[in-house]
């Protein structure tokens, strides 16, 4: 008989509400005692959430950064929560034990996964509570992306109160393009989003839309008023070119370079620097958008036009990574590289031709089944699930965000269900 794999072990677990003793010990000593103070997090309440104390309920939040557990759970202590966390994180050695000990729900992002839904429903039935970040992945741009498909249906099915947090300053503390934290300030608003009676009277689509509207936040716009200084030791823009790859002046793709507090185009010299308030300050004679988020959306508009051209394709050599069947990933790796080949996106979907484990290997995912990708850490690589198996791509160029945007916009152009925010679509239609 073959040895049972880590994947089989993980998906064979029957989860239960987390141990109150362990949760409160970690919550009070480590999170409240150390991390909340370290990140200068402050909590305000727009509703009386104490009336729900001890009941089963769900907390949702905008997914500002990789540190969001520090900014959500403390708002509701002494209540305890099971978190919903990306499936792949359970295979990383520095996280594997704590995630299992805390009865964390493993979720395969952006794909249907009945196991995760069953475990969430079981935890709620047994009197537990869940913290869920419905975007599925931490913010890339500094603002939200639409919540993952099915979020409204899930909340309606659970049928318990839905409370929320809205995090301001979380992205600027831990931006997607850089793994070094920048300490400044984080403001967290907590309140009540839905009562069970409200959920019962709403359609899943209405719930989903209200989730998107209530949780939307733009950290760059917030800091225009808040004026919080974030300390990055002179490296505010390090790796920012991986996120902002398009030059807003000459239109060059993958022509941006960054380092220290500077970002500029190798092709035309257009550039500037990012100060400790995240203000984009153009060099003399240069042209830059108002904020990095505005730049990001302009870049998306460029990619949207590109993918709608007849015969569009995007192709690149990539290395292929998978999760280990036995044991865990060490040195904070996110996958084991087991192959390589050519990845291609077109109007039909995503194609791969190459090798895996020394053997020829190929796959195809129809574009309507591929709304977006995940990113485990920063903007250096991306992943999806192929026939249920985590598959990570390491591109030769700094092109991860190009792949993300091109796939999302192709999915939308071909009638996929994961569309952009309605208010952004309306703005685009108005030109």
Regions found by a protein language model. Name each.
Residues 205-243:
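A conserved mid-domain beta-alpha-beta active-site/ligand-binding segment of alpha/beta enzyme cores
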Residues 228, 232-287:
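Cys/His-rich short segments
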Residues 19-27, 36-209, 226-227, 233, ...:
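Soluble catalytic domains of membrane acyltransferases
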Residues 98, 204-219, 399-418:
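Short amphipathic C-terminal alpha-helix that caps PH/PH-like domains
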């Amino acid at each position: 008989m073959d040895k049972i794999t880590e994947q089989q072990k993980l998906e064979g677990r029957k989860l239960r509400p987390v141990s109150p003793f362990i949760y409160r010990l970690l919550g009070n000593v480590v999170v409240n005692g150390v991390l909340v103070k370290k990140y200068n997090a402050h909590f305000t309440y727009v509703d009386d959430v104490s009336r729900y104390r001890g009941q089963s309920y769900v907390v949702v939040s905008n997914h500002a950064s990789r540190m969001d557990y520090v900014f959500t759970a403390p708002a509701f202590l002494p209540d305890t929560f099971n978190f919903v966390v990306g499936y792949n994180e359970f295979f990383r050695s520095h996280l594997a034990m704590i995630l299992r000990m805390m009865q964390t729900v493993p979720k395969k992002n952006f794909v249907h996964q009945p196991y995760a839904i069953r475990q969430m429903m079981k935890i709620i039935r047994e009197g537990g509570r869940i913290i869920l970040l419905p975007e599925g992945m931490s913010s890339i741009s500094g603002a939200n992306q639409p919540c993952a498909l099915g979020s409204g249906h899930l909340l309606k099915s659970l049928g318990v109160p839905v409370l929320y947090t809205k995090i301001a300053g979380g992205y600027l503390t831990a931006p997607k393009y850089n793994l070094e934290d920048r300490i400044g300030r984080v403001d967290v608003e907590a309140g009540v989003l839905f009562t069970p009676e409200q959920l019962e009277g709403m359609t899943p689509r209405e719930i989903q839309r209200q989730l998107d509207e209530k949780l939307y936040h733009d950290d760059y716009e917030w800091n225009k008023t808040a004026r919080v200084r974030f300390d990055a030791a002179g490296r505010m823009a390090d790796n920012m070119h991986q996120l902002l790859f398009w030059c807003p002046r000459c239109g060059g793709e993958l022509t941006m370079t960054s380092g220290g507090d500077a970002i500029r185009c190798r092709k035309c010299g257009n550039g500037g620097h990012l100060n400790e308030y995240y203000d984009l300050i153009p060099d003399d004679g240069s042209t830059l958008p108002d904020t990095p988020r505005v730049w990001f959306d302009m870049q998306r508009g460029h990619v949207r036009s590109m993918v709608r051209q007849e015969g569009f394709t995007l192709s690149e050599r990539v290395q292929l990574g998978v999760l280990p069947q036995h044991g865990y990933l060490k040195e904070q790796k996110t996958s084991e590289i087991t192959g390589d080949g050519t990845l291609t996106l077109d109007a039909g979907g995503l194609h791969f031709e190459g090798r895996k484990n020394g053997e020829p290997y190929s796959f195809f995912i129809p574009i309507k089944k591929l709304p977006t990708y995940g990113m485990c850490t920063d903007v250096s690589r991306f992943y999806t699930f192929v026939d249920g198996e985590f598959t990570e791509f390491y591109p030769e160029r700094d092109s991860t965000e190009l792949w993300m945007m091109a796939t999302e916009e192709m999915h939308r152009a071909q009638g996929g269900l994961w569309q952009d925010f309605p208010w952004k679509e309306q703005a685009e239609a108005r030109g």
